[in-house]
Amino acid sequence: MRNWCLCQICTCGSDYRPYEIVKQPRHIPEEYKPKQGKIDLGTTYKRDFNPYKVQPLIKVRPVERQQVKKGKLDTVPTYKDDYRSWDIQKCELCKPEQAYHPPDVKFGNSTTFQDDYVPQEIKPRQSFKPCSVVKCSVGPFNGDTSHRRDYVPHQLEVKFARPKEIYKPTDQPFEDLTTHRNDFQGLAGETAKICRPAYTRVTQNIQFKGSTEFRDSFQPWEIPPPKVKKVAEYVPPSGSMQLNSTSHLDYVPYQASRVVAIRPVSHRRQSNFPFQGKSTTKEDFPAWEICRQGLIKQQQQIPNPSGKFEGLSTFRSHFVPHELIPTESCKPLNEALKSSVPLDDVTMYSIQFTPKKQEICPASYPSPPGYIFENTNSQGHKFFRKIIPAVKAF
């Protein structure tokens, strides 16, 4: 007989107790074992590639033509004018002059790659690509499909044409009375009062003052001139400069020969005709004479005011006061619609509502009805056995 826990019998969820969560075993992956044998590093690209001889590109860029300017160029910068050079004597080199002679014997030390590498013959892979030869059929092409063979044409029936209805306007007037207007009965109430204050026009005959609160609070003050920092006079150091460095003192000469340059010989193009330093840009755009541009100053369009400031603006001088006319209210009167018929407050919900009986949770009893207590486990769950009703014998 199956035993039922109190958590399973309860319908409200108040007697639920959590069960112990069993942790699932973790899958341990197998140890990786590398495959035996050697890897064939030959590819189809290395097998089928045919190298081509590459020729150097010919430069399309034209020869640079320098512009020769007439007149003497002042090449003395401000650094040379301000810089004071020292009287430095040239030091003689302590390194002896030696010519480098490369060895004639071949370098005999081999690398680890040359010792361990064993060249292998590349075997061509078997091609599984089908043959590209097209097999031509001898007989004529049969263009009949299963749809063409099995299709049976049927005769279409005549389509029924519905006659168009003629619109006939009604003679009765349009009723614009809605259910809301018919059933709604407004409540009588007081009209809302206007909280806006009455408009009072302020007229002043006093002359306008040009001063503001900001001008009164923040008066101009005198700004002191900036301080000029005095530069100390340059004093040259006394004595001679020691030009001996750690490299000159600790240098040990070695017997070595000079390295021969591996740079290839440059092949320059030799032309017999004289160089023409002219271009279309130089001919069309000759050099302009540099002159200082004058100061661009716009003419003053508004004349300076003359006389004392009146404090009257254009808005005040051209302003014409008008009498305020109140706006006519188009709001309808707040009158309640009265009806002699009483309000029908019956709804579909009140007609079709069926009250349900409140059920009592069986777990709220000390012993649930229809169950017999069996035992309690280590976690505190109570188990009950269901009572089977007795069957009467015939």
From Swiss-Prot:
Region of interest called Mn 1, as start-end residue ranges on this chain: 110-122
Positions of the UniProt region annotated as Mn 2: 144-158
Stretches the record annotates as Mn 5: 312-324
Region (Mn 4): 278-292
Region described as Mn 3: 244-256
InterPro entries: SAXO1/2
A Pfam family: SAXO1-2
Domain of life where this protein originates: Eukaryota
Region annotation (Mn 6) ranges: 346-360
GO cellular component annotations of the record: nucleus
Membership in a protein family: Belongs to the FAM154 family.
Protein's name according to its UniProt entry: Stabilizer of axonemal microtubules 2
Highest classification ranks of the organism: Eukaryota, Metazoa, Chordata, Craniata, Vertebrata
